[in-house]
Amino acid sequence: MDIWEKLYLEAKALYAPQEVSDFVYARHVVAAVEAADGQIFTGFCMEGTCGVFHLCAERAALFNMYQQSGQTKVKRIIAFRDKPPYGEGSGMPCGACREFLLELDAENRHLEFMVDYESRKTITLGELMPLWWGEEQARQRENKGNE
């Protein structure tokens, strides 16, 4: 079993779409992240009808990672609905998730997202966001740490 299959199976265990209330639904998108140390953390989405409350599965998994381990660096992420990512975009993160990953740790630009599970095609966050607005500030911080 490769790491992608392991991530897929961990996330798939959470998939169980449900209406939490008349206004909130959850578990229709699931995700698993592999942290820098190899631990796997999972999450599922929750959405409210007012639009203010929306937590993507990727960010839920990242919150779990940080809460449970204090880690900020990610190696891999898989996110999907009822089947593994396929084609050219079914598993791609939204803009808020991309931004959060870079703000959490600029090194996350190297993490891989699963694009097509069957072929194992991946893309890096840096490829998705080549001109991130915070890059200069992140480099300055990295350089201070290396002095």
Regions inferred by a protein language model and the residue ranges of each:
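Histidine- and/or cysteine-centered catalytic micro-motif in compact active-site loops
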Residues: 34-36, 45-48, 82
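Short beta-strand scaffold segments in enzyme catalytic cores
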Residues: 25-36
